[in-house]
């Protein structure tokens, strides 16, 4: 009887041990979908749990019209380090029975400091991310308990793809993660150093350009080129100092042209009328009434008087000088009037004025 009891207890212990080890393997390899339970029942249980959680979290809200005041900005340190998974995973049956060692406890702050120092000695934050092969820059960065460093987004994508919590480098299971900012700090220092280098180079180049503008070179060709540039710069500065208001000049030209057109139009109205033969006869009669016997330009007798009579000629060898009648009823020698018109061509062109009455005229040679 005792032997049978011992055998049955041993068989029960072996069964429990086998089940515990199988459960541990399923949890370790994350093969929950291989459970012997009906998958439809598992899905129904999950739906019931979700509905219960929704019912438990449902609360009635009454809109009173009052709005909560917006909270101020979070004044926490943006570079504060924190652990992402502080709670360890639940123990499996094999770990509870002592068949397998339990998972390690969460690391303390001192242990995290030692892990971080080991990562700094390895230079992981200086090197690119092992998953995406890109610099850390200002992207979120995580440190694993195995002292390896990755992008937070890259590690989450790796865990989602492999469906395991295993380090991509050393394959350590159930690691712990901590958010750090060493890569961002090193990237800021690198950017600041690069900006300072560019700024110093700009200052030195600017100082050297000003120095070249002041001190002439010793070489003859360069010295000649230096003074040519100086002379060009001074000439350009003088030209820029002049006030060349082209629009104002054009406006003045337009005003002058308008005034000249108005004057010419008035003169054309006064002097541009065509005088008929009857009008000339009236003008000649008016000139005879004035009794003009000599040219007012040369003060010599006219060869043809205003009354139509020919003047007496002293000698037969002298030819009579042509007499011209103006539209203002004045008489002159034709040669004298032409000389006067040629002399005063630039003053009253294209119209001429009578030497006596200063009015515009039209002329006609008086026939003997």
From Swiss-Prot:
Domain of life: Eukaryota
CDD domains: IQCD, RING-H2_RNF32_rpt1, RING-H2_RNF32_rpt2
The entry's keywords: Cytoplasm, Metal-binding, Repeat, Zinc, Zinc-finger
ZnF region ranges: RING-type: 129-171, 295-358
Protein's cellular compartments: Cytoplasm
Note: No coding region alterations in either Hemimelic extra-toes (Hx) or Hammertoe (Hm) mutant mice was detected.
Its biological purpose: May play a role in sperm formation.
Protein name: RING finger protein 32
């Amino acid at each position: 009887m005792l032997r049978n009891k011992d055998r049955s207890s041993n068989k029960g212990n072996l069964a429990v041990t086998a089940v515990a080890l199988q459960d541990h393997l399923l949890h370790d390899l994350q093969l929950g979908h291989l459970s012997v339970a009906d998958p439809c029942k598992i899905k129904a249980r999950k739906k019931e749990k979700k509905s219960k959680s929704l019912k438990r979290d449902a609360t009635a809200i009454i809109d009173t019209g009052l709005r909560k005041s917006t909270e101020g900005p979070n004044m926490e340190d943006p570079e504060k380090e924190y652990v992402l998974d502080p709670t360890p995973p639940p123990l499996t049956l094999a770990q509870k029975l002592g068949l397998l060692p339990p998972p390690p406890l969460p690391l303390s702050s001192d242990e995290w400091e030692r892990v971080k120092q080991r990562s700094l000695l390895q230079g992981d934050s200086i090197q690119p991310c092992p998953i995406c092969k890109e610099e850390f820059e200002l992207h979120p960065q995580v440190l694993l308990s195995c002292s390896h460093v990755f992008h937070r987004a890259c590690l989450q994508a790796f865990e989602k793809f492999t469906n395991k919590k295993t380090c991509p480098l050393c394959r350590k299971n159930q690691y712990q993660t901590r958010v750090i900012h060493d890569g961002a700090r090193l990237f800021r220092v690198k950017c600041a150093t690069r900006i300072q280098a560019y700024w110093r180079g700009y200052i030195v180049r600017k100082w050297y350009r000003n120095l070249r503008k002041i001190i002439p070179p010793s070489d003859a060709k360069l010295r000649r080129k230096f003074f040519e540039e100086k002379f060009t710069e001074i000439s350009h500065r003088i030209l820029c100092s002049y006030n060349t208001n082209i629009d104002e000049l054009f406006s003045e030209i337009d005003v002058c042209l308008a005034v000249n057109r108005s004057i010419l139009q008035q003169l054309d109205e006064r002097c541009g009328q065509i005088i008929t033969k009857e009008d000339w006869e009236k003008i000649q009669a008016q000139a005879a009434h004035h009794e003009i016997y000599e040219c007012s330009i040369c003060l010599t007798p006219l060869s043809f008087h205003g009354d139509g009579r020919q003047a007496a000629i002293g000698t037969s060898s002298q030819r009579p000088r042509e007499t011209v009648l103006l539209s203002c009823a004045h008489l002159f020698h034709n040669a004298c009037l032409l000389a006067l018109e040629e002399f005063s061509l630039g003053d009253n062109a294209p119209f001429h004025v009578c030497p006596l009455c200063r009015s515009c005229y039209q002329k006609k040679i008086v026939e003997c």
